[in-house]
Amino acid sequence: MGWKTLDDMDLQGKSVLTRVDINVPMEDGKVTDDTRIRRLVPTISDLLSKGAKPVLLAHFGRPKGKVVPEMSLQPLVPALEAAFGAPVMFVADCRGPAAKGAVDALAPGQILLLENTRFYPGEEQNDADLAKEMAALGDIYCNDAFSAAHRAHASTEALARLLPACAGRLMEAELKALEGSLATPERPVTAVVGGAKVSTKLDLLGNLVAKVDTLVIGGGMANTFLAAQGIDVGKSLCEHDMTGTAKDIMARAEAAGCTILLPSDVVVAREFKAGADNETVPADACPADAMILDAGPASVAAISTVFAESKTLIWNGPLGAFEIAPFDIATNTAAQKAAELTKAGQLISVAGGGDTVAALNQAGAAEAFSYISTAGGAFLEWMEGKVLPGVAALQT
């Protein structure tokens, strides 16, 4: 798969329409987590140092094609200026004469932020006319929003086909990390898939069993796989209507030579609360009035052994009810093992998904992972083997 990067473009004096994801959490008009903004610094710095004029295109919230003042991007200007160390101008449109005038007035070293692309219904409809009006504002298109690449919108798909297009530094890093973990990985490859429900990760599981050597299943979905083997899981979270599907996934894994690792022992409790009385029992011995809330120490030891024998790790979803202690132990211990192996240069570790990032941060392991995707839905769709419109539009 080939795409151009900033290195392939002549940027001097050019207006570069740069699609970014600055859909950040805010309270009282202030940004509460600027992670997504900080991850754009390499691209913006590169554009400025090469004499380009960065013109930022972004969405915020779900205004559904109408102008919703509370979803204006203007309040983000101070956070952008702080992160980029450069003046950020703002214009209350993303097309038309006002936007064009603001682009033309941009001085070297300045950045322009256009208004929320979703204020126009044409954005989410991938409207060709809106894309043409956006294209009139720039010379080059740069997509640095992998997290929005699974949506075919005017600013991510149609626009990319109207101007010379390239990937920004964040997009480039994300694509390299994901290609390296799934398309051309160093083997053996292990995937950890956790979380509550099999039903939400069917496509993911189906794609992974054909591509990885070991699939570690944890969280609530492990209970469904245990139930599929005829094991009584008591009052545990379990999708009993999905046991047939779980059996099918196990059969497909066997046919593909993929080993599925399920918990051999589990931590059970009778109440779902922090510090609840709990005990560790074999996976097939959950009391009828108890629920499985975490993988046990023998299971974690088996997972750690698999990690140590692997060269590549893909992680999506926690191994237990990580939000409440002590049912965070399996997730924390396994994450710390992966971090240790990564630091030692023995493992390439890639993780993504909201709960996953929160769990790895809680374990103090996130910093050591080779790559952590902030992309959520786009990360999952890539892992499911789906074509992402925003990436396909950049392909050369």
Curated annotation (Swiss-Prot):
<dbReference type="InterPro" id="IPR015824">
    <property type="entry name" value="Phosphoglycerate_kinase_N"/>
</dbReference>
<feature type="binding site">
    <location>
        <begin position="59"/>
        <end position="62"/>
    </location>
    <ligand>
        <name>substrate</name>
    </ligand>
</feature>
<dbReference type="GO" id="GO:0005524">
    <property type="term" value="F:ATP binding"/>
</dbReference>
<comment type="similarity">
    <text>Belongs to the phosphoglycerate kinase family.</text>
</comment>
<dbReference type="GO" id="GO:0004618">
    <property type="term" value="F:phosphoglycerate kinase activity"/>
</dbReference>
<dbReference type="Pfam" id="PF00162">
    <property type="entry name" value="PGK"/>
</dbReference>
<feature type="binding site">
    <location>
        <position position="151"/>
    </location>
    <ligand>
        <name>substrate</name>
    </ligand>
</feature>
<keyword id="KW-0963">Cytoplasm</keyword>
<dbReference type="InterPro" id="IPR036043">
    <property type="entry name" value="Phosphoglycerate_kinase_sf"/>
</dbReference>
<feature type="binding site">
    <location>
        <begin position="21"/>
        <end position="23"/>
    </location>
    <ligand>
        <name>substrate</name>
    </ligand>
</feature>
<dbReference type="GO" id="GO:0006096">
    <property type="term" value="P:glycolytic process"/>
</dbReference>
<feature type="binding site">
    <location>
        <position position="323"/>
    </location>
    <ligand>
        <name>ATP</name>
    </ligand>
</feature>
<keyword id="KW-0808">Transferase</keyword>
<dbReference type="GO" id="GO:0006094">
    <property type="term" value="P:gluconeogenesis"/>
</dbReference>
<protein>
    <recommendedName>
        <fullName>Phosphoglycerate kinase</fullName>
        <ecNumber>2.7.2.3</ecNumber>
    </recommendedName>
</protein>
<keyword id="KW-0067">ATP-binding</keyword>
<feature type="binding site">
    <location>
        <position position="201"/>
    </location>
    <ligand>
        <name>ATP</name>
    </ligand>
</feature>
<comment type="pathway">
    <text>Carbohydrate degradation; glycolysis; pyruvate from D-glyceraldehyde 3-phosphate: step 2/5.</text>
</comment>
<keyword id="KW-0547">Nucleotide-binding</keyword>
<dbReference type="GO" id="GO:0043531">
    <property type="term" value="F:ADP binding"/>
</dbReference>
<dbReference type="InterPro" id="IPR001576">
    <property type="entry name" value="Phosphoglycerate_kinase"/>
</dbReference>
<feature type="binding site">
    <location>
        <position position="36"/>
    </location>
    <ligand>
        <name>substrate</name>
    </ligand>
</feature>
<dbReference type="GO" id="GO:0005829">
    <property type="term" value="C:cytosol"/>
</dbReference>
<feature type="binding site">
    <location>
        <position position="118"/>
    </location>
    <ligand>
        <name>substrate</name>
    </ligand>
</feature>
<keyword id="KW-0418">Kinase</keyword>
<keyword id="KW-0324">Glycolysis</keyword>
<feature type="binding site">
    <location>
        <begin position="353"/>
        <end position="356"/>
    </location>
    <ligand>
        <name>ATP</name>
    </ligand>
</feature>
<comment type="subunit">
    <text>Monomer.</text>
</comment>
